[in-house]
Amino acid sequence: MTFGRSGAASVVLNVGGARYSLSRELLKDFPLRRVSRLHGCRSERDVLEVCDDYDRERNEYFFDRHSEAFGFILLYVRGHGKLRFAPRMCELSFYNEMIYWGLEGAHLEYCCQRRLDDRMSDTYTFYSADEPGVLGRDEARPGGAEAAPSRRWLERMRRTFEEPTSSLAAQILASVSVVFVIVSMVVLCASTLPDWRNAAADNRSLDDRSRYSAGPGREPSGIIEAICIGWFTAECIVRFIVSKNKCEFVKRPLNIIDLLAITPYYISVLMTVFTGENSQLQRAGVTLRVLRMMRIFWVIKLARHFIGLQTLGLTLKRCYREMVMLLVFICVAMAIFSALSQLLEHGLDLETSNKDFTSIPAACWWVIISMTTVGYGDMYPITVPGRILGGVCVVSGIVLLALPITFIYHSFVQCYHELKFRSARYSRSLSTEFLN
């Protein structure tokens, strides 16, 4: 180290106000790359490329960084522990400190690596739709200036259809879509009423039509159904055209549900038009009815417009490990209690056996409703050991179901605040657009 106060045996690192004294020899082979680079500095300019400031008289180097994070990193490189996130510090901020000092994500403990991956994935999802530099990069390419207006128009259309709170037009479009979803659900539910079915059958009998037809009949419900299907079809086509990644669009669960819900209507119409009769429809009637009932999943489309459903979906996505753990708990307990209950109620004394517990699969139903404290009362133990086992089953169900609830609750609160923050940002942009 040729730069610095001559004769000084040590140097001082001042990181965010915390001072650390290191010998020159230790500085040469220090594990942190940024610190070890100080040993090769030959001028003040070289030093200021490594640190933020330098005091030649005291031989002190200043780093305007997070002192607590550096303390954790310093303990790790000195071999006094494993590298974990500092308490009360954002994972991304701590990772930024690691990159600054020359460490990588692989140096973190596995649990912290998972936390970092989850946070980076959530942050990417949160900000990817609001990336401001995409259009600028397109304009910088050859021919990008001419194509930029069309790209801006497509991006504006995409946000209008995909982000209901991004603009005033998006909110109006979302409101219309919600109305169509509600009307479609009401018609679908009403069509299963006996009086509704009888009236529809009487109308169809005038044209010698079958009892089931998915086509647009002359009754008002058929007209309403055709209008709703037309709206959803147009919406799906426009969203596909303006989407950035067509393959990713097709793979989305909501879009798959849209396709499965729309297709049966057009299949039935085409079969009626080309065959002129409904014999083919009768053969495929069960399949079409099942697919037609897929329209009930259109209610999930409301998740695009209501923050509560979005919070629920995001919570389930982030807590899939806890959900799997809960499922494993229930399956293990169900296997144990169902086998014991079948043995106590039916397997020991065949003469006075309980006919409801004839097999372990039959006992599984009783275990599930007991662990969840529902208790329909359709089957219950009659022997003393069986009733004792039932009490243990109920208590264990309460305990097992309560274990992962804390993690899921905290994740739900975090997801709710994140989505509220995003909604507030869009509301501010919407207010600006309305005022302008």
Swiss-Prot record:
Tissue specificity statement from the Swiss-Prot or TrEMBL entry: Expressed in the brain, liver, testis, small intestine, colon, thymus and adrenal gland.
Transmembrane segments: 169-190, 221-242, 254-274, 285-305, 321-342, 388-416
Keywords, sorted A to Z: Cell membrane, Cytoplasm, Ion channel, Ion transport, Membrane, Potassium, Potassium channel, Potassium transport, Transmembrane, Transmembrane helix, Transport, Voltage-gated channel
Residues in the bilayer without spanning it: 361-372, 373-380
Localization annotation: Cell membrane; Cytoplasm
A single cellular component GO annotation: membrane
Topological domains annotated Cytoplasmic: 1-168, 243-253, 306-320, 417-436
One GO BP: potassium ion transmembrane transport
Example GO molecular function: voltage-gated potassium channel activity
Taxonomic superkingdom: Eukaryota
Membrane topology type: Multi-pass membrane protein
Keyword Transmembrane helix: yes
SMART domains from the UniProt entry: BTB (SM00225)
Residues in the Extracellular compartment per record: 191-220, 275-284, 343-360, 381-387
InterPro entries: BTB/POZ_dom, Ion_trans_dom, K_chnl_volt-dep_Kv, K_chnl_volt-dep_Kv5/Kv9, SKP1/BTB/POZ_sf, T1-type_BTB, VG_K_chnl, Volt_channel_dom_sf
Family the entry assigns: Belongs to the potassium channel family. G (TC 1.A.1.2) subfamily. Kv6.3/KCNG3 sub-subfamily.
Subunit structure: Heterotetramer with KCNB1. Does not form homomultimers.
Role according to the record: Regulatory subunit of the voltage-gated potassium (Kv) channel which, when coassembled with KCNB1, modulates the kinetics parameters of the heterotetrameric channel namely the inactivation and deactivation rate. Potassium channel subunit that does not form functional channels by itself. Reduces the deactivation rate. Moderately accelerates activation.
Recorded domain comment: The transmembrane segment S4 functions as a voltage-sensor and is characterized by a series of positively charged amino acids at every third position. Channel opening and closing is effected by a conformation change that affects the position and orientation of the voltage-sensor paddle formed by S3 and S4 within the membrane. A transmembrane electric field that is positive inside would push the positively charged S4 segment outwards, thereby opening the pore, while a field that is negative inside would pull the S4 segment inwards and close the pore.
Name of the molecule in the record: Voltage-gated potassium channel regulatory subunit KCNG3
